[in-house]
């Protein structure tokens, strides 16, 4: 009977001896009961009742003994179970329920166990009977082995509610059952003494060992396969070692055993146009398919096939042309090959000559550049006779000064920061440190914008006086806003590039952005009698920093103001005419200008004639159309301008013919 001991009692030798003595006494009692079974049935019933009472008392008092050996079966119970035929009617409570397994109830109600474990009872049988039944009969050895392998936990059956199969048993009910057991044992142990390490014991109870023999009862019976597939993974949700089961490796299903060919055969392709089977279809694109008797099932499908085939041909890259490298006969005739050899020899000779001349040119360093040019160039007789360039005098005066006795006095002056700037080196700066003005001893002056870009530069000209150039505030390629010269000629420009104000020694004119002249004037001191009105001052703002003031011919100035710094440069001119009557009036209008004005009047007359023909298609009305009044006034003004400008008579006659020409 040594192999029926509890596995939890191996550690304590005193308890082992006590267990062995208990088992021997129980064995003797069971042997006596077997011998006197037929005669003393009533005594056995009383002994069974006494044993049940002792089990209840032992559960309440001796909890530690139950914890040490929860899986041990008493021999008395075993003998009773083996004699099932005799006690089937008398002891229905002692029958072992091995046919079905029930799940624990979710309720915490305590149900007393129907089975009882044997305790130590004094034996009244003689020692001879004990020795005669020390081992099991051979007929029960097999049953004993099977029972030991199943290792049924009787303590689990206490709180099981009959009628609930394992198929509906849940983890929650099973864990709740274990929790109820721990709570009941905890209450019973508190009555006697406080446990030493209660928390550690509770943790041990909650941890589930997957290899524990208690789990065997769930699959050692008639539904082992169902348990393995359904419930065994769920009982391993609280592993004591290793990661959670959700992180465990799960091998993917393999597709080796699947026959895809069968699946393809089951779903055969259908034509979207006529619905016929396409398994017999042979396409030029699908090379792997087998050729069939017919190409397509309908015309629409055949058109689709042709379109796909054409697109495939278009997108297909051209085949690479391979060069034949096999030995072959010589290309061309012998004459061609000889000519090719001669050309190759000629090229080699030319290369040698070129290298030879290069060496000679390096050695002959005493030759002059003219000699080398003569050797390399071909000269002609006419190319040697190069005409001399005419020297053009850079005179800024008007053409009237060439034949007249005029004297011009420049009125140049510079004022910076309220002080007159003399011919000396001077520098001024803005408040933030950048340069404002630089003046040199020769009269050159530079004025800068606050951004550092050049605004005004004043340099001396070749004749007399200075020239001022005004630029816009741009770092690269700035546009010129004005060019003013102290010798009498100046011009200012609009932002679009058209002339704004033009001045010469005789007068000036003012124009708008489109280039139309608004007014013109003559200087009062140059010509005594003038058909023009007297001069009125002109003020121009070239940008936010620079302005131009024209008060008189000798009072023309450029002003600059930025960040509290101010500068002014005067570029006026005084002209003295000993005989003003000798200078013709408006001599600056040439004959070509007058011819252009006459042609303009003629063009406008033609446009008026075309407009009349469009509006009045009848030819009778054309003769009644008259010339517009504004064209007649322009013609009269042009004739008067020709007389006042003093042009030649032949030019005057040509202008009249253009104006009076019949259209």
Curated annotation (Swiss-Prot):
Residues 1-74, 106-136 are annotated as: Disordered. Its main location: nucleus. It comes from Homo sapiens (Human). The keyword Hydrolase does not apply. It comes from the Eukaryota. Keywords: Nucleus. Residues 20-69 have a biased composition (Acidic residues). The gene is ERICH6. PANTHER family: GLUTAMATE-RICH PROTEIN 6 (PTHR23093:SF11), SIMILAR TO CHROMOSOME 3 OPEN READING FRAME 20 (PTHR23093). GO terms for cellular component: nucleus. InterPro entries: FAM194_C (IPR029281). The keyword Nucleus applies. This is Glutamate-rich protein 6. It is found in: Nucleus. Belongs to the ERICH6 family. Residues 112-132 have a biased composition (Low complexity).
């Amino acid at each position: 009977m040594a192999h029926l001991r509890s596995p939890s009692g191996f550690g304590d030798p005193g308890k082992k001896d006590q267990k062995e003595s208990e088992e021997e006494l129980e064995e003797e009692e069971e042997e006596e009961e077997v011998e006197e079974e037929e005669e003393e049935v009533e005594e056995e019933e009383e002994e069974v009742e006494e044993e049940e009472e002792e089990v209840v008392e032992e559960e309440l008092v001796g909890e530690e003994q139950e914890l040490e050996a929860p899986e041990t079966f008493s021999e008395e119970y075993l003998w009773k179970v083996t004699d099932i035929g005799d006690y089937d009617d008398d002891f229905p409570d002692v029958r072992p329920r091995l046919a079905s397994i029930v799940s624990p109830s979710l309720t915490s109600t305590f149900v007393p166990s129907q089975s009882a474990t044997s305790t130590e009872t004094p034996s009244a049988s003689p020692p001879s009977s004990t020795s005669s039944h020390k081992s099991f009969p051979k007929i029960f050895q097999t049953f004993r082995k099977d029972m030991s392998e199943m290792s049924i936990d009787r303590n689990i059956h206490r709180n099981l509610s009959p009628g609930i199969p394992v198929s509906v048993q849940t983890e929650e009910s099973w864990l709740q059952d274990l929790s109820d057991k721990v709570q009941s044992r905890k209450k019973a142990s508190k009555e006697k003494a406080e446990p030493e390490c209660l928390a550690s014991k509770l943790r041990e109870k909650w941890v589930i060992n997957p290899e524990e023999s208690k789990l065997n009862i769930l699959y050692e019976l008639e539904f082992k396969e169902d348990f393995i597939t359904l419930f065994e993974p769920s009982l391993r949700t609280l592993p004591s070692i290793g990661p959670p089961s959700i992180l465990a490796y799960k091998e993917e299903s393999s597709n080796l055993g699947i026959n895809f060919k069968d699946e393809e055969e089951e779903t055969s392709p259908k034509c979207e146009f006529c619905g016929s089977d396409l398994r017999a279809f042979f396409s030029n694109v699908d090379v792997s398919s087998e050729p069939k008797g017919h190409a397509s099932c309908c015309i629409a499908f055949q058109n689709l096939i042709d379109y796909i085939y054409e697109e495939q041909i278009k997108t297909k890259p051209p085949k690479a042309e391979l060069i034949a490298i096999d030995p072959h006969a010589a290309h061309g005739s012998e004459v061609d090959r000889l000519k090719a050899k001669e050309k190759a020899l000629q090229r080699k000779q030319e290369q040698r000559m070129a290298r030879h001349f290069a060496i000679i040119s390096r050695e002959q360093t005493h030759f002059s550049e003219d000699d080398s040019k003569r050797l390399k160039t071909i000269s002609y007789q006419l190319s040697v006779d190069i005409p001399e360039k005419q020297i053009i005098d850079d005179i800024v005066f008007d053409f009237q000064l060439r034949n007249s006795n005029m004297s011009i006095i420049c009125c140049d002056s510079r004022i910076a920061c309220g002080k007159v700037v003399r011919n000396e080196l001077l520098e001024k700066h803005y408040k933030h440190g950048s340069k404002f003005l630089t003046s040199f001893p020769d009269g050159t002056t530079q004025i800068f914008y606050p951004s550092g870009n050049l605004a005004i530069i004043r340099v001396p000209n070749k004749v007399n006086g200075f020239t001022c150039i005004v630029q816009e505030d741009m770092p690269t390629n700035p546009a010129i806003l004005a060019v003013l010269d102290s010798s009498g000629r100046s011009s200012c420009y609009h932002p679009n590039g058209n002339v704004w104000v033009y001045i010469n020694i005789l007068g000036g004119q003012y124009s708008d952005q489109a280039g139309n002249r608004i007014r013109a004037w003559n200087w009062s001191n140059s010509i005594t009698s003038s058909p023009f009105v007297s001069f009125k001052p002109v003020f121009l703002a070239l940008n936010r920093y620079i302005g131009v003031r024209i008060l008189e011919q000798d009072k023309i100035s450029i002003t600059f103001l930025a960040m509290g710094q101010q500068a002014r440069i005067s570029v006026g001119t005084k002209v003295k005419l000993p005989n003003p009557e000798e200078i013709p009036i408006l001599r600056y209008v040439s004959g070509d200008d007058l011819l252009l004005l006459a042609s303009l009047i003629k063009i406008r007359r033609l446009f008026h004639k075309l407009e009349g023909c469009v509006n009045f298609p009848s030819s009778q009305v054309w003769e009644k159309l008259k010339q517009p009044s504004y064209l007649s006034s322009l013609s009269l003004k042009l004739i008067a301008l020709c007389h006042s400008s003093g042009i030649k008579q032949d030019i005057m006659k040509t202008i009249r013919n253009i104006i009076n020409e019949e259209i």
